[in-house]
Amino acid sequence: MNLNNMNNELNFVYKENKCCLACGCNNLKIILDLGDQPLANNYHNNEKQEKYPLKLNLCNVCYHLQLSHIVNPDLMFKHYLYVSGTSQTLKDYFDFFSKKTLEYTPNARTVLDIACNDGTQLDSYKILGLETYGIDPAKNLYKDSVNKGHNIICDYFNESTIYNFSNKKFDIITAQNVLAHTEYAKNFLESCKLIMKEDSILFVQTSQSNMIENNEFDTIYHEHVSFFNTNSMKNLVERSGLVLNDVFKTDIHGGSYVFVITKKQLKLESNNVLEQLQIEKQNGLYDVTTYLNYALKCYNSAISLKTQIQELKNKDYIMIGYGAAAKGNTLLNFSNIFLDKIIDDNPLKQNLFTPGMNIPIVNSDILLTINVNHKIAFIPLAWNFYKEIKERIKKKRNNNNDLFVKYFPTINIER
């Protein structure tokens, strides 16, 4: 797409997506309708929230899942309250990820992290001796990265902004949970290609790899316009003139793909791409019936969770969410669940309200003010950090009557 046309198309609030973002066809089918919802990261001071359609389309050709409507990215990313550095689990993962990528290219000297957030991933690369660069449109996070000594551009990543790096080409390019945020996925990869050397490697990470298997619907919100499988990624990569050389899965964010992309075929010992394609086919990911069943399970899951939480309220449990995560807002809004409070360790979210359900967000110190004998049922909304959340709560409050409610893949209550 011509960049001027792309910029002109940004003058909208939201629009319908009529073509597959991976393979380009127009054979799309609505699979799941989560209703009209507010922007999942639009935490506010008890203000009225605009709502937008939140529906999931399936491509009948490459089986790429994608939103039926796309919201203007400026409404979501210019002021961003999700911060990577507040989770120790994520910091540990970034250390693993940086070392893992260097196994593919041990002589790398430069790295570009697209959508670098507060620079936490770049911190890991800097410790390993690499020259670190990043790009991110969030103006409120820009100084955090710069103050750590990283070279940062505050903007969206595209074929125009890459020239702010003075025609530099990078040994490693990382794009974690960002390709799924853009409707211009092909342009994104083509722009990456322009700043890759012949032996550079692009690592694209996408979450939701277990989304269908575990009946997860909370990761569907307006920021996530795409939900990749290996087949749809392979289609997109090849349309962009690149090669999908490898793929591996990690446990982060409840299960993620990491796609290893290059300008030419590398001599790798693994047959992971072929194997993953076969696994996905065996699991029914290339069959529309699987997705229709998934939608039905999502509706039933929402009803069951609402019923379970109401039963706990009837037993005089205080209902507290932990982690004011975007995914939690999809869950709460779709299920129409109200909690007493939500705890979050990110100061940028504290003393605000969640979008849609308008639940107050508080500091974890509130646990010290609640009578230790009063029963609390905790709902870890950032369930991808469940173990870390449970440990944090236990350190501040030790009550054997407290409950922890897990809801994917099925509802499970623990002490």
What is the predicted role of each segment?
Residues 199-207, 403-406:
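Conserved beta-strand signature within the Rossmann-like core of class I S-adenosyl-L-methionine
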Residues 49-144, 216, 221, 226, ...:
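Extended interfacial segments that mediate partner engagement and assembly in macromolecular machines
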Residues 174:
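A conserved beta-strand element that flanks and buttresses the S-adenosyl-L-methionine
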Residues 202-226, 230-232:
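Short, glycine-/aromatic-enriched active-site segment of Class I SAM-dependent methyltransferases
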Residues 186-201:
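A short glycine-rich, Lys/Arg-flanked "PGG" loop and its adjoining helix->strand segment in the class I
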